[in-house]
């Protein structure tokens, strides 16, 4: 047990949580990393690396592991939550009794609340109350590249100006990690959820063998869907041309480090949903996000035809090629109508 102060407590010891913890520690900050599985944390402590996901990224001396949640949270007022979206609310409930009175919460989770499709800010407010400062980071980041110290840029949005400035100072590294602040709290959250869905579609297109033209069309029209939904929810449309929108969308739609894209490729090649998920071996956020994003769009009367067809493939057993033909056969329209 170690209660020495830390600049940040990172909750979630998967690939991305570990990569962010390493990045913070390399910036010279004291960081404590906690995960839900004590055996996993003990193994990380023994190996001084995350051998399962990031075997080549050694832990800096300023990164310590913690199996006791209360101790991890007592060490820092600033808490970075990096867990799958479907357990986000449950994890916040777990954290709540142990948070310091001056705690501030930031998350790197991309997605919406399971079943309800609510933005994660609404979940956080419900669990933690209105007073606690909140923030979100999002953008084109693969954990392996981040942990390797390769150049990366993200967007940061917060409900609190001081928290935003403090986080930018903590995270920013002039050698490899650039952090752009953005006042659009809704837009930065939403981009990370919608891009997961479109990445599955881009993967399906490539799995079928449709080529670069089709993939690019899906990215472009997927961006239009993201922007339409964001605008309906009160986001700034320009956010979706930045790191949390177009940046993350292009990354996950074009590189096979993306689990969502690889999942889509397998579906396009004819594998079933369960088999494709098993082959990935990690959480495919876009699978749940598809249902949640579509439900959110329908509640707000927003047309999202690509998302609708991906939903049909994932949940209604529609063939991926048939879904593509449905999109191609839609009524002719002006590109600028409804974005």
From Swiss-Prot:
Q: Where is the active site?
A: 195 (proton acceptor)
Coiled-coil stretches are none
Molecular function via GO: glycerol-3-phosphate dehydrogenase [NAD(P)+] activity; NAD binding
Where in or outside the cell is it found? Cytoplasm
Q: Broadest EC class?
A: oxidoreductase
Q: Name one GO cellular component term.
A: cytosol
Q: Does the keyword Isomerase apply?
A: no
Q: Where does sn-glycerol 3-phosphate bind?
A: 110, 139, 141, 195, 248, 258-260
Q: Which residues cross the membrane?
A: none
Q: One Pfam family, please name it.
A: NAD_Gly3P_dh_N
Q: Which domain of life is it from?
A: Bacteria
Which reaction is catalysed here? sn-glycerol 3-phosphate + NAD(+) = dihydroxyacetone phosphate + NADH + H(+); sn-glycerol 3-phosphate + NADP(+) = dihydroxyacetone phosphate + NADPH + H(+)
Annotated PANTHER family:
GLYCEROL-3-PHOSPHATE DEHYDROGENASE (PTHR11728), GLYCEROL-3-PHOSPHATE DEHYDROGENASE [NAD(+)] 2, CHLOROPLASTIC (PTHR11728:SF1)
The record's listing under NCBIfam families reads: PRK00094.1-1, PRK00094.1-2, PRK00094.1-4
Instruction: Tell me what this protein is called.
Output: Glycerol-3-phosphate dehydrogenase [NAD(P)+]
């Amino acid at each position: 047990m170690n209660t020495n102060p830390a600049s940040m407590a990172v909750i979630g010891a998967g690939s991305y949580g570990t990569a962010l913890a390493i990045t913070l520690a390399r910036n010279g900050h004291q960081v404590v990393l906690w995960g839900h599985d004590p055996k996993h944390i003990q193994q990380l402590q023994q190996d001084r690396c995350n051998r399962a996901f990031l075997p080549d990224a050694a832990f800096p001396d300023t990164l310590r592991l913690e199996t006791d949640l209360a101790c991890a949270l007592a060490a820092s007022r600033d808490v970075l939550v990096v867990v799958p979206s479907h357990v986000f609310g449950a994890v916040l409930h777990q954290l709540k009794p142990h948070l310091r009175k001056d705690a501030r919460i930031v998350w790197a989770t991309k997605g919406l609340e399971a079943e309800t499709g609510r933005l994660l800010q609404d979940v956080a407010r419900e669990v933690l109350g209105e007073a606690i400062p909140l923030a979100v980071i999002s953008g084109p980041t693969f954990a392996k590249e981040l942990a390797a110290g390769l150049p990366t840029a993200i967007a940061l949005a917060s409900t609190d100006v001081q928290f935003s400035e403090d986080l930018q100072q903590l995270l920013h590294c002039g050698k490899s990690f650039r952090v752009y602040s953005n006042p659009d709290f809704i837009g930065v959250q939403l981009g990370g959820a919608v891009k997961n869905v479109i990445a599955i579609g881009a993967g399906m297109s490539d799995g079928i063998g449709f080529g670069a033209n089709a993939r690019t069309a899906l990215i472009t029209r997927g961006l239009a869907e993201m922007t339409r939904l964001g605008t309906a929810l009160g986001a700034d449309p320009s956010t979706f041309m930045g790191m949390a929108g177009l940046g993350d969308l292009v990354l996950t739609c074009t590189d096979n480090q993306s689990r969502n894209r690889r999942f889509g490729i397998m579906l396009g090649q004819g594998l079933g949903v369960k088999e494709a998920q098993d082959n990935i071996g990690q959480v495919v956020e876009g699978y749940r996000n598809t249902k949640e994003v579509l439900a959110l769009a329908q509640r707000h009367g927003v047309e999202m035809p690509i998302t609708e067809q991906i939903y049909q493939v994932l949940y209604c057993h529609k063939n991926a090629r048939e879904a593509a033909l449905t999109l191609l056969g839609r009524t002719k329209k002006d590109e600028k109508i409804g974005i």
